[in-house]
């Protein structure tokens, strides 16, 4: 009997998962639009989401660039704590980048005045460095320093974690941002300044039993979304997980067999590469096939630059099917048409990302909301299953 109890306790210990609740908030684009600031912002900032995946590096000064405008449409955010005692921050959990950064008390920019700021002097475990970091986004940049401290993530105490502390931030962009900073969950090979990503540090310290994390994004306007570190919760999906090999260990890059509509190939007919990215809200692809998709679904550009469709037409639009590793993943019009305050906006975006293996597609939140996603570092694979 004692052995049975012991085995039960061991099994239970191996299934411990750490969950970080994500809250769905109003995106920065929507906030700017409601305040009548979006048109002016778009005029001043030449948005180029592709720069997220091809940053410009200046190694001699340890300055790294990563465009912040990629987070213009983000809606899902979680809370972490940094320091001892912990100071709380709202961050984007981003599988399309690898660094952690938050505002600091050294920042006097307007954007920092209405966000949480980390104070190293209030933390007994903070360790400073002489390294600097700069994250650019067009006409301005976030500059700061790198330091080490304990990061609290969903009940995990991640000690000796390197992160960026901002000293200047571009007010015209970040002042209205619904988040304080970014927590990257991609591979360490794309980490700026060679900083160890949060999940790598967690795994290296033996703080989780499985070298993987998983994501569930709820369509609910408020709650229900979650990032799970070190485990998989089958209550969030139906059927079985289908596993897809990672083709390049940088971003979470996989092969897509084809993209079809009404049984006909509309893109990626001979296969293509895609990145599964929680830090991108839309489904993006090369401008030419995306333009064809927009035409097929009857989308046209409005004065804000959004591709809009008639809300009454949604029920008659077809699914768009992504075939991945031989399995079909339909995305229905209720998912790829985003409805907000009487407007219906296409969830597709054109973006050219040329690589040696061809143009990249980005499977952002529009896709991930439909499919529970496991990011398996141990086996370098992505698991997908329909959400429950």
UniProtKB/Swiss-Prot annotation:
Enzyme class: hydrolase
Residue ranges of domain Peptidase A1 in the record: 76-385
MF (Gene Ontology): aspartic-type endopeptidase activity
Protein name: Pepsin A-4
Task of the protein: Shows particularly broad specificity; although bonds involving phenylalanine and leucine are preferred, many others are also cleaved to some extent.
Subcellular location: Secreted
Family: Belongs to the peptidase A1 family.
Species assigned in the record: Homo sapiens (Human)
Pfam family, one: Asp
Active site (record annotation): 94, 277
EC number: 3.4.23.1
Listed InterPro entries: Aspartic_peptidase_A1, Aspartic_peptidase_AS, Aspartic_peptidase_N, Pepsin_A, PEPTIDASE_A1, Peptidase_aspartic_dom_sf
Annotated SUPFAM superfamilies: Acid proteases
Residues carrying Phosphoserine: 130
């Amino acid at each position: 009997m004692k052995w049975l109890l012991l085995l039960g306790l061991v099994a239970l210990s191996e299934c411990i998962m750490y969950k970080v609740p994500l809250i769905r908030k109003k995106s920065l684009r929507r906030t700017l639009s409601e305040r009548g600031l979006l048109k002016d912002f778009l005029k001043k900032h030449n948005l180029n989401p592709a720069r997220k995946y091809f940053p410009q590096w200046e190694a001699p000064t340890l300055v790294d660039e990563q465009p912040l405008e990629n987070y213009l449409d983000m809606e899902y955010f979680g809370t972490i704590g940094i320091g001892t005692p912990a100071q709380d921050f709202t961050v984007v959990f981003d599988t399309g980048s690898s660094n952690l950064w938050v505002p600091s008390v050294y920042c006097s920019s307007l954007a920092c005045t209405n966000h949480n700021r980390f104070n190293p002097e209030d933390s007994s475990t903070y360790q400073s460095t002489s390294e600097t970091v700069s994250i650019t986004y067009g006409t301005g940049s976030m500059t700061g320093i790198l330091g080490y401290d304990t990061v609290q993530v969903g009940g995990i105490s991640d000690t000796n974690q390197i992160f960026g502390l901002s000293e200047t931030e571009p007010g015209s962009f970040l002042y209205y941002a619904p988040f304080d900073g970014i927590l990257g969950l991609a591979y360490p090979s794309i980490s700026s300044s060679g900083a160890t990503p949060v999940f790598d540090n967690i795994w290296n310290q033996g703080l989780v039993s499985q070298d993987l994390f998983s994501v569930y994004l709820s369509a609910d306007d408020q709650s229900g979304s979650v990032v799970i570190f070190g485990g998989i919760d089958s209550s969030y999906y139906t059927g079985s997980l289908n596993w897809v090999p990672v083709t390049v260990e940088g971003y979470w890059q996989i092969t897509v067999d084809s993209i079809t509509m009404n049984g006909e190939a509309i893109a990626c007919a001979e296969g293509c590469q895609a990145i599964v990215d929680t830090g991108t809200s839309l489904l993006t692809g090369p401008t030419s096939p995306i333009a064809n998709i927009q035409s097929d679904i009857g989308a046209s550009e409005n004065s804000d630059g959004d591709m809009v469709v008639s809300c009454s037409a949604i029920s008659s639009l077809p699914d768009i099917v992504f075939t991945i590793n031989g399995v079909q993943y339909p995305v229905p019009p209720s998912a790829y048409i985003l409805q907000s305050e009487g407007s219906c906006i296409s969830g597709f975006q054109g973006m050219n990302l040329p690589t040696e293996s061809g143009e990249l597609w980005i499977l952002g939140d529009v896709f991930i909301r439909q499919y529970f996603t496991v990011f398996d570092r141990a086996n370098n694979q992505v698991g997908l299953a329909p959400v429950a």
